[in-house]
């Protein structure tokens, strides 16, 4: 069954140009998510943790 599906997928006629475009879009989405979500959240967590230091 798996071989049949693989053969069907490989003979579907997908072009390498479409695959490259999709890969570039995926990497761009990861970078945008990092810039818009992860970096500000990390900066906010670091800022809060520095402001709320424990006194020992």
From Swiss-Prot:
Disulfide pairings: none
Pfam families cross-referenced by the UniProt entry: PsbX
An individual GO BP term: photosynthesis
Topology within the bilayer: Single-pass membrane protein
Compartment(s): Cellular thylakoid membrane
Family as reported in the entry's similarity comment: Belongs to the PsbX family. Type 2 subfamily.
Name of protein: Photosystem II reaction center X protein
């Amino acid at each position: 069954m798996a071989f049949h599906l693989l053969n069907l997928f490989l003979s579907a006629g997908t072009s390498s140009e479409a695959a490259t475009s999709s890969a570039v879009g995926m990497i761009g989405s990861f970078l945008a998510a990092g810039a818009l979500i992860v970096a500000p959240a990390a900066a906010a967590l670091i800022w809060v943790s520095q402001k709320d230091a424990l006194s020992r």
